[in-house]
Regions:
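Helix-loop-helix junctions within the multi-pass membrane cores of secondary transporters/permeases
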Residues: 33-116, 170-171
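Flexible, glycine/charged-enriched surface loops at secondary-structure junctions
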Residues: 24, 61, 66, 160, ...
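Short, small-residue-biased leader/transition segments that mark boundaries at the very start
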Residues: 1-6
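Transmembrane helical segments that form the transport core of multi-pass membrane transport proteins
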Residues: 18, 23-24
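Helix-loop junctions at the membrane-solvent interface of multi-pass transporters
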Residues: 17-18, 118
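Membrane-interacting alpha-helical segments
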Residues: 29-32, 36, 40, 154, ...
Length: 180
């Protein structure tokens, strides 16, 4: 949760302010409907129409940019999910007494990045990816039950952050790309 807040406020707020030349307050106010929908549905794919509407109508992003960036982001921008899964793998490894070496952490990190790109933007889409990572880390199968039981709580925040990242990317692209 703390990493989500940091990423949402500091990273995306800073990108919008310094790269997108837009007030972070205006940005976060404008995207609130999409962020709340993402939080409630746990689906970045279901939030695509609302995200497009927010960035086009409230932030002045062109349809050309939002029509590419929002769906692409909903498909491959799963960085918050990747962060949550990394923390969960290390938490469960410590809780189960599984020693994860530095080299294994690097392998898990690389696999996590690849798996997060392939994670579907639907509720619970990260469960299969987590199962693969848990197996790689040598965690017992019982951790899946615990992970599935808390996944929705983590998924709500992670999906919200992913969708905010998609919209922040649109604002930055609008500033950086000349559409003449």
């Amino acid at each position: 949760a703390a990493s989500d807040v940091y990423k949402r406020q500091i990273v995306y707020g800073g990108a919008v302010k310094f790269l997108g030349k837009t007030s972070p307050f205006k940005f976060f106010r404008a995207i609130m409907p999409a962020a709340l929908n993402a939080f409630g549905t746990c689906s970045s794919s279901a939030t695509i129409p609302i995200s497009k509407s927010c960035v086009e109508n409230e932030l002045g992003v062109s349809n050309q940019i939002s029509s590419i960036a929002i769906p692409l982001g909903a498909t491959v921008n799963m960085d918050a999910v990747s962060i949550v899964m990394s923390f969960m793998i290390m938490f469960f490894a410590n809780a189960c007494g599984v020693n994860v070496s530095v080299s294994m952490m690097i392998i898990i990190l690389l696999a996590n990045v690849l798996l997060s790109v392939g994670t579907p933007g639907i509720p619970g889409g990260a469960i299969a990816s987590f199962a693969a990572l848990a197996t790689m880390a040598g965690l017992p199968a019982g951790v899946m039950g615990v992970y599935i039981s808390i996944n929705t709580l983590c998924d709500m925040g992670a999906t919200c952050v992913n969708v905010i990242g998609d919209m922040a990317g649109c604002v930055v692209l609008q500033e950086k790309i000349d559409l003449k």
